[in-house]
Structures are given as C-alpha cells and as structure tokens.
Regions:
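Conserved acetyl-CoA pyrophosphate-binding loop and the N-cap/start of the following alpha-helix
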Residues: 86, 90-98
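Conserved GNAT acetyl-CoA-binding A-motif
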Residues: 96, 103-116
C-alpha cells in the first residue's frame, strides 16, 4: 500500500495525542496486557524530543507510532501499532516507508527500535537488523534493531 490522499500519516502535537493513545491502549494495554503506567510515559505528555504520528485511511484512525530524537543523527522509533481489525492491510509497511523517508529528510543516519520478538520478521522485511540479545520490556521479549539510512 502506498500512502495517498486517503491514506496518510500526520504529526500529532503532544496536546492532541488522544487518538494515538486510544490505539495504543487497545493494542498494548488491552490486547497485550501492558500496565498503563508502563505504556503511558513522559514522552506522551510534554517531551519536545518526541513526535507522535497518526496513521489514517479515509479519515479513519488505524495506527500510530512515535519518534524520539534524543541522540544526534539517530531517530528511535517506538510504539508502532495498528488496530487489530486493520492489520494485514499494509499500514505498517506504509508507516515504515514513511518513517525512513522522513528520517532521511531530517538528516538522520540511523533508526533504532525495540522490536517485540514476534514482529522481528516484519522489521527485517523493512530493512532492519537485530543488534542485541533478547531483553524483557513490560514482560514481553524484545530485541534492539536498527536500520542504517
């Protein structure tokens, strides 16, 4: 799926992230049983080093992710998720394509992320490679991955 006028990704300001948080609550808190206090953090309230992105299709919210810029030239992507009923339709791939182009445009040389182990094949298909051993985050197995731009 390519992003078009009906399918797009937009930056959400910190004071208007309720749509992003709704998707994350459904996926991470309700579906994966991540405690609210671990899922919602300072990056969701007032952190200027973080941008939230909303994935939409014909005006319907379908997914979200966020980027953290706390290291020069490196963007750290977190919280990529899509509503369960909207999975398998290419929104994740569209988000990753957008993410890579946006980070290149901003002068980033690398993107890092902490991937849940079940999602590693997806990220590998988007050009990411594992660079760590397995670690637990919110009780879920993850590995650090990166993509050199």
């Amino acid at each position: 799926m390519n992003l078009s006028e009906s399918n797009n990704i937009k930056i959400i300001k910190t004071d208007d992230i309720n749509a992003c948080l709704e998707i994350r609550r459904k996926v991470f808190i309700d579906e994966q049983n991540v405690p609210t206090e671990l899922e919602i953090d300072d990056y969701d309230t007032s952190n200027s080093e973080c941008e939230h992105f909303l994935i939409t299709d014909n005006g319907t919210n379908v997914g979200t992710f966020r980027l953290i810029y706390d290291k020069p030239e490196i963007a750290h992507m977190q919280r990529l998720c899509v509503f369960p009923e909207m999975r398998g339709k290419g929104y994740g791939y569209s988000a990753m394509s957008f993410l890579k182009e946006e980070c290149k445009r901003r002068g980033n040389s690398k993107i890092t992320l902490g991937a849940q182990c079940h999602a590693i094949p997806f990220y590998e298909s988007c050009g990411f490679v594992c660079v760590s051993d397995v670690f637990l985050d919110a009780g879920i197995e993850h590995r650090t991955m990166e993509c050199v731009l």
